[in-house]
UniProtKB/Swiss-Prot annotation:
Residue ranges of domain ACT in the record: 75-150
Protein name: UPF0735 ACT domain-containing protein SaurJH9_1700
SUPFAM superfamilies according to UniProt: ACT-like
Similarity comment: family membership: Belongs to the UPF0735 family.
Domain of life according to the entry: Bacteria
Matching InterPro entries: ACT-like_dom_sf, ACT_dom, UPF0735_ACT_dom-cont
Stretches of the chain forming a coiled coil according to its record: none
PROSITE patterns on file: ACT
Amino acid sequence: MMDNKDYKKFYLIREDVLPESVVKTLKIKDALKSDPTLSIYDAVKQFDLSRSAFYKYRETIFPVDDKMLDHREFTLILYVTDIVGMLARVLDVISKLELSVLTIHQSIPMEEKATITLSLNAKSKETSVEDVIGALRNLDYVSKVELISMSM
């Protein structure tokens, strides 16, 4: 079993909120990868970053590959009013957004309320998770939509 002190958490974070030195480190790594003749000394000089900053981050920051983004899987939970055809309405939105349904579960209604849990795959880069949540929130009889998990 892994010791807790050895466990490293990972985060997916947008580039525009990263410190400049981290972004430069990624650019340097990319430059070194695409030009094997480029030295670390010349690369850090080219991107105006200290070698110590480069060495600090180079083994801890990795870009998310475009191929990873091709298969975005996420799970949503919808809180809905129990009406006839509600699940069909939800699936119609999912179909229009060209998402693949991986799993689906509808709870037994209690006091005219139910939940629908959907695991979805968004292969299209044009469809963001925010777009999906927004489209489902706009449905009548949907009181709440929550993202409960996401993987790349």
